[in-house]
């Protein structure tokens, strides 16, 4: 394999309240599981999609980025997704700034990691992300096992793509 397919936006995105980007979805959990999830199931189970970008919306008031059932139980348990979960742009910090489901940026990150998010996308500067991860490891908010598992998911995709054997691009190919 030389290409990994990353599906987005997992899940329930596309029907936001008032048509506003990032707004909670108008669909309840039952509708999301009935109408949205089967599409992702087909993509992971039958088509072999590798990883996903989770959406920044909430379903019934619960942000997808911190939903363990959706990101871990279903995605990795039922669908057997082999890769990683990337947060959509600012999805993690939105738990603090928009959804108000996390009291602090640190709590927002902890909830995302615990739910199964492996890669953050523009939520924190690299310095702040490293600082918060170190703090959470030190105070027990997350475990080294959780961090190792998350890191292994990212490395697994890189290994599947052969990036450890030949990390170069054939520059003679046209895009």
Regions found by a protein language model. Give the residues of each.
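Glycoside hydrolase catalytic-domain context in secreted enzymes
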Residues: 1-175
């Amino acid at each position: 394999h030389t290409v990994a397919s990353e599906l987005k936006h997992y899940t329930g995105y596309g029907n936001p309240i008032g048509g506003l980007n990032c707004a909670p979805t108008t669909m309840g959990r039952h509708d999301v599981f009935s109408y949205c999830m089967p599409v992702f199931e087909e993509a992971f189970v039958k088509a072999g999609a590798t990883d996903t970008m989770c959406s920044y919306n909430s379903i019934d008031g619960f942000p997808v980025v911190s939903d363990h059932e959706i990101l871990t139980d279903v995605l990795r348990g039922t669908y057997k997704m082999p890769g990683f979960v990337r947060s959509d742009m600012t999805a993690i910090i939105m738990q603090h700034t928009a959804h108000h489901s996390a009291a602090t940026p640190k709590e927002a990150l902890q909830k995302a990691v615990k739910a199964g998010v492996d890669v953050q996308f523009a939520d924190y500067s690299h310095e702040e992300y490293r600082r918060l991860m170190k703090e959470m490891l030190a105070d027990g908010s997350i475990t080294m096992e959780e961090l190792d598992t998350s890191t292994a998911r990212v490395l697994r995709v890189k290994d599947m793509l052969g990036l450890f054997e030949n990390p170069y691009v054939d520059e003679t190919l046209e895009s």
